[in-house]
Amino acid sequence: PIGAMTRSNFINNPVGINSYQYASLVLYFSSLSGDKIVKEMRNVHYSTNTTLEKVVLEQLAAGPVNSKLSGVLTEEVRVLDVKVSEKTCTLNLNQAFLDTAAGTAAPEVVIYAMVNSLCDNLGVDKVQFQVEGTSDVVYGDSLSLAGPFHRNSDIIEIQEIQEQVTEAAESESQELGEPQIGL
């Protein structure tokens, strides 16, 4: 016989098997022209059993919410493994990643949408790509994946937020300042 169980017989772990976490993600998708990436913010709840790097990649695969943006990953692309070690994220994808490289976005756009999304959310400095465990591959017939990729700010399309704010202020002043006749 074991005897009566006391409080010290149990593990006090506030994070359980079916617990969820919340994250505000910075994701990058292709512009419709396919030559730049555009930032999209997304709030997600995800299982504590799933790593943040997998959540970021799943959200990239789900595509953008904004209809003025285009996705960078197809449904056929699978993440075989993803690891973070010493400020480097190593991402191993299946062969479909190379097979679907002939999309509308430039190869650099697809790669840096993934790199910038992973760097911004995970705090890593670089991303090393692998396809079926091999880094010595070429993406889109022109981009070697042999070396690690660092975050690239030059490829980000800066949206003119100031113009949107100015237009909103002008429309609001017209609504408030001009009495409309015939209502």
Segments the model singles out, each with a brief description of its role:
Residues 1-183:
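Bimodal "functional hotspot" detector
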